[in-house]
């Protein structure tokens, strides 16, 4: 691609110019809405074409957009695609690369230990000056020993890069909130500063605030921090966790009970096996023993709190937990486009308990995520469901030991009041997580998994607990059916001591095994089997109640119903409604489909394909850039962070093939295109898998990259480093 973009290019002029220019080989195509003949109930919508003419694995690009050898420009996408859970665990896979040696060799073309360089001022501005008027800074605690700059005019002239001219030179943070949280460090500081003359004749630089914007940006929900961010804990609270000053009495008591009960069960079951081997028959005395067996075991130290009622339905598509890509700005974007529920990136339990700053940052949610979903169920569908108390944001954790998960759940639900659910990841396939005994390794230890979920349910206060699982760890040995029965009814160990169900509120099944990778499709027929099982178990829940004593409601799933979500390869509204109508899941969790085209939630809501024009797609990129600056700051560091995550997003969105270019519908997430061109230059640019084009797109909104900025995509062939 030879077209260059000056750093002052804006969406309004740059995008339109690219759409309207171009050689005669590019067709101009306005935004279109391709709508199928949809029946009244969109669940039963059928694809337009039966796919008989389609070549498996190849996107059916229309002849006029194919590029033959020697023609330019063109797009031919590579197939270095990671499956849903690999995308979810990207950050943890990178840790494996830090160990080097054999592990690094095993990754082959993958950049596992990625580095992104630095984006910072040549010399930083002291915090005592960063938000103060020029002539009245706060006192610096380091005095003459401070290594940062205190002369504001010198900093602005010599150490800070020139202001960005994107967004018409207006700071997106100041425009949204009436003040800029980056102060003098902002790359748009010229848009919210002025020089005033004092009574003594001196001139002073001051930051400007806008009261009208500030009032309009007041949070709609109590408890939010600056920028409408929720679940942000203080430095003091993190220090208390690091120094083990914050106690977790519930987790400690329940873990002790679990350990003692497990030992008793082991002794008891050993005795039963010995009796069976010696053909001891069950006489009257033995039957009496069965009835009073539970008296030999201690009761749990406390019962779970009553849980907030949940609802999942066909009108509530869910955004999957996505590490790296599932950051706050991206989730905010998806909620705006129609996602009803979101999850944090997968957080590791032990760092949460130890107060690690990076892990606690994953708990932060945007204001739009702590509001109730925009759609509520019909009256009476869910007993005692209170829509006003519901919210969209849940967290996902990973753990390999019960005490870690319990402590993490207890402190999270205590310190973060805006959580819909705490989800346990039991499906992460990454070797580092698996070898540690977490993620999909828990599928091989169902009793341990049940203990973890029971404990989490006991200490999570009113917040429900859920689990995300895979079909199993090996291709030909699916275990999800047995595991689901255990999680819904309770395993034999806990049933024997009268503890009943595990209390899990929802289960998500990814239709792949740990062994399986993206090259094969998710198994929705198996997901359908599991959905049928859960329906039967939910319908029979009253009949399956403990026969010795009635199980306490607090031990049951909220509302005595376990919701079931399917996950894997959902790429259109047709895939979504087919999964609900034919497979019988309550709703679908969407991962790669949302990364490749975030407006999939709009399509689901509309029940039709949306053929986004190139400028419409670029406006989504622009919106992500704005939300990134709001979340990470508009200073040099924040701009660099936003650029890094924008490039991560573009590494997925470039794989989207506009449906107006396809010969047959529906599009398939596994299909790869032959070399093709877009309907205009901008559309071709957005489809490029060349990292240089991704950088070019980022510069439309974030200006030229810092000289020390470096970007290493997942695949080594796409690395980028600024050349000074």
Swiss-Prot record:
Similarity field: Belongs to the Dus family. Dus3 subfamily.
EC numbers, comma separated: 1.3.1.89, 1.3.1.-
Keyword list, A-Z: Cytoplasm, Flavoprotein, FMN, Metal-binding, mRNA processing, NAD, NADP, Nucleus, Oxidoreductase, Repeat, tRNA processing, Zinc, Zinc-finger
Major place of residence: cytoplasm
ZnF endpoints (C3H1-type): 120-153, 171-192
GO biological process: mRNA processing
Name of the protein described by the UniProt record: tRNA-dihydrouridine(47) synthase [NAD(P)(+)]
Record bears the keyword Iron-sulfur: no
Protein residues bound to FMN: 321-323, 396, 468, 510, 567-569, 591-592
UniProt-annotated location(s): Cytoplasm; Nucleus
Organism: Coccidioides immitis (strain RS) (Valley fever fungus)
Domain of life: Eukaryota
Entry cofactors: FMN
InterPro entries in the cross-refs: Aldolase_TIM, DUS-like_FMN-bd, tRNA_hU_synthase_CS, Znf_CCCH
Region: Disordered, residue numbers: 1-135
Compositional bias of kind Polar residues: 1-12
Gene Ontology MF terms in the entry: flavin adenine dinucleotide binding; mRNA dihydrouridine synthase activity; RNA binding; tRNA-dihydrouridine47 synthase activity; zinc ion binding
Reported function: Catalyzes the synthesis of dihydrouridine, a modified base found in the D-loop of most tRNAs. Specifically modifies U47 in cytoplasmic tRNAs. Catalyzes the synthesis of dihydrouridine in some mRNAs, thereby affecting their translation.
A GO cellular-component term linked to this record: nucleus
Catalytic reaction(s) noted: 5,6-dihydrouridine(47) in tRNA + NAD(+) = uridine(47) in tRNA + NADH + H(+); 5,6-dihydrouridine(47) in tRNA + NADP(+) = uridine(47) in tRNA + NADPH + H(+); a 5,6-dihydrouridine in mRNA + NAD(+) = a uridine in mRNA + NADH + H(+); a 5,6-dihydrouridine in mRNA + NADP(+) = a uridine in mRNA + NADPH + H(+)
Active site: 428 (proton donor)
Keyword Iron set for record: no
């Amino acid at each position: 691609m030879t077209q260059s973009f000056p750093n002052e290019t804006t969406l309004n002029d740059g995008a339109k110019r690219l759409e309207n220019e171009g050689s005669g080989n590019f067709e101009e195509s306005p935004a279109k809405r391709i709508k199928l003949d949809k029946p009244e109930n969109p669940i039963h919508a059928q694809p337009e074409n039966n796919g008989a003419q389609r070549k498996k694995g190849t996107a059916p690009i229309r002849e006029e957009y194919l590029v033959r050898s020697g023609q330019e420009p063109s797009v031919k996408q590579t197939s270095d695609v990671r499956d849903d859970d690999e995308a979810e665990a990207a950050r943890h896979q990178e840790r494996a690369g830090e160990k080097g040696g054999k592990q690094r060799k095993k990754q082959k073309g993958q950049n596992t230990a990625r580095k992104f360089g630095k984006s910072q001022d040549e010399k930083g501005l002291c915090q005592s000056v960063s938000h103060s008027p020029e002539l009245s800074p706060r006192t610096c605690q380091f005095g003459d020993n401070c290594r940062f700059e205190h002369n504001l005019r010198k900093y602005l002239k010599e150490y800070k890069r020139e202001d960005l001219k994107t967004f018409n030179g207006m700071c997106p943070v100041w425009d949204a909130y009436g003040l800029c949280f980056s102060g003098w460090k902002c790359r748009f500081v010229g848009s919210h500063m002025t020089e005033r003359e004092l009574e003594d004749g001196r001139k002073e630089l001051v930051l400007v605030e806008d009261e009208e914007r500030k009032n309009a940006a007041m949070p709609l929900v109590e408890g939010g921090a600056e920028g409408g961010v929720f679940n942000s804990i203080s430095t003091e609270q993190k220090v208390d966790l690091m120094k083990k000053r914050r106690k977790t009495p519930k987790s400690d008591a329940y873990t002790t009970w679990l350990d003692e009960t497990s030992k008793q069960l082991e002794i008891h079951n050993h005795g039963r096996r010995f009796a069976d081997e010696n053909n001891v028959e069950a006489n009257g005395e033995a039957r009496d023993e069965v009835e009073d067996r539970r008296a030999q075991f201690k009761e749990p130290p406390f019962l779970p709190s009553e849980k907030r009622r949940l609802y999942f339905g066909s009108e509530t598509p869910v955004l999957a937990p996505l590490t790296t890509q599932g950051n706050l700005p991206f989730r905010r974007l998806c909620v705006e486009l129609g996602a009803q529920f979101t999850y944090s990136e997968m957080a590791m339990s032990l760092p949460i308990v130890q107060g690690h700053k990076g892990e606690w940052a994953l708990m932060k949610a945007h204001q739009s995520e702590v509001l109730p979903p925009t759609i509520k169920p019909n009256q009476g569908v869910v007993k005692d469901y209170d829509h006003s108390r519901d919210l969209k944001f849940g967290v996902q954790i990973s753990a390999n030991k019960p005490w870690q998960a319990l402590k993490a759940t207890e402190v999270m639900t205590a310190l973060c009041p805006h959580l819909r659910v705490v989800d346990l990841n039991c499906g992460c396939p990454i070797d580092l997580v698996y070898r540690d005994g977490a993620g999909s390794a828990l599928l091989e230890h169902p009793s341990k998994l049940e203990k973890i979920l029971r404990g989490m349910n006991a200490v999570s206060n009113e917040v429900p607990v859920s689990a995300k699982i895979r079909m199993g760890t090996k291709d030909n040995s699916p275990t999800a059916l047995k595991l689901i029965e255990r999680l819904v009814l309770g395993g034999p160990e806990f049933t024997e001591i009268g503890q009943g169900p595990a209390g899990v509120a929802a289960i998500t099944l990814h239709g792949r095994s740990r062994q399986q990778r993206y090259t094969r499709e998710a198994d929705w027929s198996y997901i359908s089997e599991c959905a049928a099982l859960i329906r039967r178990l939910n319908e029979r829940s009253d009949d399956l109640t403990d026969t010795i004593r009635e199980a306490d409601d607090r031990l049951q799933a909220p509302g005595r119903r376990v919701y079931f979500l399917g996950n894997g390869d959902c790429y259109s509204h047709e895939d979504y409604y087919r999964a609900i109508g034919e497979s019988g899941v309550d709703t679908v969790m969407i991962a790669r489909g949302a990364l490749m085209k975030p407006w999939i939630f709009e399509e689901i809501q509309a029940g039709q394909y949306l053929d986004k024009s190139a400028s419409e797609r670029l406006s989504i990129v622009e919106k992500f850039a704005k939300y990134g600056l709001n979340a990470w700051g508009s200073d040099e560091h924040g701009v660099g962070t936003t650029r890094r995550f924008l490039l991560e997003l573009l590494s997925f969105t470039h794989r989207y093939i506009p449906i107006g270019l396809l010969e047959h519908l529906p599009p398939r997430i596994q299909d790869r295109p032959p070399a093709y061109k877009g309907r205009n230059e901008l559309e071709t640019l957005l489809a490029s898998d060349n990292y240089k084009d991704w950088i070019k797109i980022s510069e439309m909104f974030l200006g030229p990259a810092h000289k020390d900025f470096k970007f290493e995509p997942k695949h080594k062939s796409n690395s980028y480093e600024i050349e000074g």
